[in-house]
């Protein structure tokens, strides 16, 4: 069976896992590194240490065929080995979808303010009539990690509107969900801003995973869940998402 390790600092990995298991039967090792939540508030130096230690931990404990770093923040800011698949904003695809040639990237503060994202955008060498707006959406990520997107949707809609109302009045018609947590808010975002197309990179990551696997004889999907934080509390949060798998503690 193909074994795929997927990690993030919280619940965000689940959106990536769902996309992977739709197209690739596999055993998923899901590690929620809650001890280091949120990645989006860590410095580049801190992230470099955390990510490299986490990759080593997963390799030594589980020997995965593929490791997925299911977070935009370290994917953009930390250099890893070829075995690791990251999550990057699908900027070229988003620009192709846009009629106004004005797109937005919604991400954590660390990503939005990073030189790494600016350098990544420059690689596309867009003409001056094409605009990429970077939007700090850390407060929206918190809505997911706190489970408010399940328990208090009215509050979430207020925060979404307050955060993005002015942004989306500026010709933006396509927005990239550049945090795996934001996938869980996609329906709420679309209901508040129906004129905006929200692009989720999860499907692209899943296709990259499938392409990296040379041979797959797996016939069913399984998932084992670990956390570096409070396993009991994380289990409750996971239950609210309809996932009943046992959560085990994994020391980092």
Where are these regions (language model features)?
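Non-catalytic structural scaffold of enzyme domains
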Residues: 1-252
């Amino acid at each position: 069976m193909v074994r795929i390790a997927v990690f993030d600092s919280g619940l965000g990995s689940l959106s990536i896992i769902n996309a992977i298991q739709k197209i690739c039967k596999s055993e998923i090792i899901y590690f929620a590194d809650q001890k280091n939540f949120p990645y989006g508030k860590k410095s580049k130096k801190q992230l470099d240490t955390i990510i490299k230690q986490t990759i080593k931990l997963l390799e030594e404990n589980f020997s995965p065929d593929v490791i997925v770093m299911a977070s935009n923040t370290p994917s953009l800011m930390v250099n890893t080995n070829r075995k690791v698949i990251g999550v990057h904003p699908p900027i070229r695809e988003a620009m192709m979808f846009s009629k106004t040639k004005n797109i937005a990237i919604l991400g954590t503060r660390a990503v939005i303010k990073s030189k790494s994202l600016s350098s990544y955008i420059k690689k596309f060498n867009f003409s001056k009539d094409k605009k990429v707006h970077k939007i700090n959406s850390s407060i929206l990520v918190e809505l997911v990690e706190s489970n408010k997107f399940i328990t208090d949707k009215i509050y979430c809609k207020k925060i979404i509107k307050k955060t993005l109302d002015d942004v989306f009045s500026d010709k933006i018609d396509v927005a990239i969900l550049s945090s795996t947590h934001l996938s869980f808010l996609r329906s709420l975002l679309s209901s508040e801003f129906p004129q905006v197309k929200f692009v989720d990179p999860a499907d692209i990551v899943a296709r990259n995973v499938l392409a990296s696997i040379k041979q797959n004889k797996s016939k069913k999907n399984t998932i084992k869940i670990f956390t570096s934080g409070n396993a009991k509390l994380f289990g409750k949060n996971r239950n609210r998402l309809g996932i009943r798998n046992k959560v085990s503690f994994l020391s980092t």
